[in-house]
Amino acid sequence: MATIQIIDSIRLNRIGLQTKDANGKWVNIHKQQGDLDGACSIYSLIMAMLCQRMIEEQDIQRYKFPDRRTPKGKFLYHFFYEQGFVQNGYNYTALAREINKQPFEIRAIHKRPRTNDDRIELIEQFVDQNIPVIISTEFNGGAHALLAIGIERDEEDIITKIFCLDPGAPSPKVSSWNCFIDVSKEGKSQYPFYYVTEINTYKVTLDDMLIIEHKNFD
């Protein structure tokens, strides 16, 4: 029998998929990007920060201008205002560097596993610790960022699906995810896995990953 594991910081109820923000308030976690921008990695970053209680919902409301006197305000201002319109996506190396040079007390760890088995194992490792993973998928013609929040294992304890929040798809209403990647079989093509949402299905491969953590000052 298959088993599903979702990070424990999120819950699904009649309002939607929610997490507690930095203020301890239950807020909707999924953020959907615009049709014209390529800032899927920034949306995934914001969702990761929300479900790890690094920011509050009010911090990211439209027309809410960040207070640049604080480290958090400087961080949000940099990504929301100084970076401008992101059309062609964000390189994870550059994104990690931008995060880590900010004064806000979080850090980004850029992971580049060499094989798909290593990538799946890394996602499992962090989901087991209830830490979401920003993952990059590549497809024929482009790349897309998602937030991995859960996994499915079969009766032999083999991972068969990676459950994600996709900023490019509608918010989930009846499950804790709005996208999954079927990794039960690895095809022989350049794009060996199926990516599935309610509006799209196409073949992808897994690529770089980002882990967002609180800085440890011990």
Question: Where is each model-derived feature located?
Answer:
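Active-site-adjacent substructure of cysteine-protease-like catalytic cores
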Residues: 112-164
